[in-house]
From Swiss-Prot:
Species of origin: Escherichia coli (strain SMS-3-5 / SECEC)
A Pfam family it matches: Glycos_transf_2
Family, per entry: Belongs to the glycosyltransferase 2 family.
Listed name of the protein: Undecaprenyl-phosphate 4-deoxy-4-formamido-L-arabinose transferase
Enzyme Commission number, as recorded: 2.4.2.53
Listed GO biological process terms: 4-amino-4-deoxy-alpha-L-arabinopyranosyl undecaprenyl phosphate biosynthetic process; lipid A biosynthetic process; lipopolysaccharide biosynthetic process; response to antibiotic
A Gene Ontology cellular-component term: plasma membrane
Periplasmic domain ranges by topology: 257-269
Topology relative to the membrane: Multi-pass membrane protein
Protein origin, superkingdom: Bacteria
Pathway: Glycolipid biosynthesis; 4-amino-4-deoxy-alpha-L-arabinose undecaprenyl phosphate biosynthesis; 4-amino-4-deoxy-alpha-L-arabinose undecaprenyl phosphate from UDP-4-deoxy-4-formamido-beta-L-arabinose and undecaprenyl phosphate: step 1/2; Bacterial outer membrane biogenesis; lipopolysaccharide biosynthesis
């Protein structure tokens, strides 16, 4: 039996990108939820290079009397997961909860995650009930979740929900990983001995629009595929072999038909030859693109540039910047 350590301090990590409309309500509701815990807490808000007034509002919130808010300002936009990792590097709690700033996942669910973590779980995930997203987002999410489950063997139902709780040793383990492309829920489950999911409410977005454009979703998909496994590279080799065998077989067939039916038939098959040629060329480009994605990520890792740069940290105990 493993010793279960009770949670003494909770750190809530929230990435913020152009969320000035939702910030006042986010801070109020998150603070109220944390106060109901009866434990020490801190709320870390990471500004991910916002172009609106979000950064200024975060600084004011940290400097308010009696504040529990730590504001971390990044110099530019690095993406949701990099911003969360920046928050992880400044937490002081022994249980860390991540939460989106759009209020689609209610902060009022925080006490339930803390209570479940107190049962001895390393990671507490969540599954969104009655999800209030578009059909495209929900369908894409289901496909990605199935891909992750088959690849990792972890029966987690909703990897896309960022309302999650992590024990401190899990966060420390993730901080020791230096890959540039990080998908936090998957990375955490690699180190977790005990993980569980609980159902949570999901609300419509009240302010603004989703920051995940179509291209950002495509980039996220590449992050998932390349950080999970090298299986696509093996599949690429298999596909190349199939195409090579198929091309050779078609060539033999064309020679036989040419000898059997004469040159007139061959002339009439020109368009079919072009169609086959373009099919093979397209398959080659797909394979080259996938291979290039892996090589590009290797190049990024070799350069060893930091995944984020923290410009300022404002803590409630002092108005001085770190």
């Amino acid at each position: 039996m493993f010793e279960i350590h009770p949670v003494k301090k909770v750190s809530v990590v929230i990435p913020v990108y152009n969320e000035q409309e939702s910030l006042p309500e986010l801070i109020r509701r998150t603070t109220k939820a944390c106060e109901s815990l009866g434990k020490e807490y801190e709320i870390l808000l990471i500004d991910d290079g916002s172009s609106d007034n979000s950064a200024h509002m975060l600084v004011e919130a940290s400097q308010a009397e009696g504040s529990h808010i730590v504001s971390i300002l990044l110099n530019r936009n690095y993406g949701q997961h990099s911003a969360i990792m920046a928050g992880f590097s400044h937490v002081t709690g022994d249980l860390i909860i991540t939460l989106d700033a759009d209020l689609q996942n209610p902060p009022e669910e925080i006490p339930r995650l803390v209570a479940k973590a107190d049962e001895g779980y390393d990671v507490v995930g969540t599954v969104r009930q009655n999800r209030q997203d578009s059909w495209f987002r929900k369908t894409a999410s289901k496909m990605i979740n199935r891909l992750i489950q088959r690849t990792t063997g972890k029966a987690m139902g909703d990897y896309g929900c960022m309302l999650r709780a992590y024990r401190r040793h899990i966060v420390d383990a993730m901080l020791h990983c230096h890959e540039r492309s990080t998908f936090i829920p998957i990375l955490a489950n690699i180190f977790a001995r005990r993980a569980i999911e609980i159902p949570v409410h999901h609300a419509e977005r009240e302010f603004g629009e989703s920051k995940y454009s179509f291209m950002r979703l495509i980039n996220l998909m590449y992050d998932l595929v390349t950080c999970l496994t090298t299986t696509p590279l093996r599949m690429l080799s298999l596909l190349g072999s199939i195409i090579a065998i198929g091309g050779f077989s078609i060539a033999v067939l064309l020679v036989i038909l040419r000898l059997t039916f004469g040159p007139q038939w061959a002339a009439e098959g020109v368009f079919m030859l072009f169609a086959v040629l373009f099919t093979f060329i397209g398959a080659q480009f797909i394979g080259m693109g996938l291979l290039g994605e892996y090589i590009g990520r290797i190049y990024t890792d070799v350069r060893a540039r930091p995944r984020y740069f923290v410009q300022q940290v404002i803590r409630p105990s002092s108005k001085e910047n770190e």
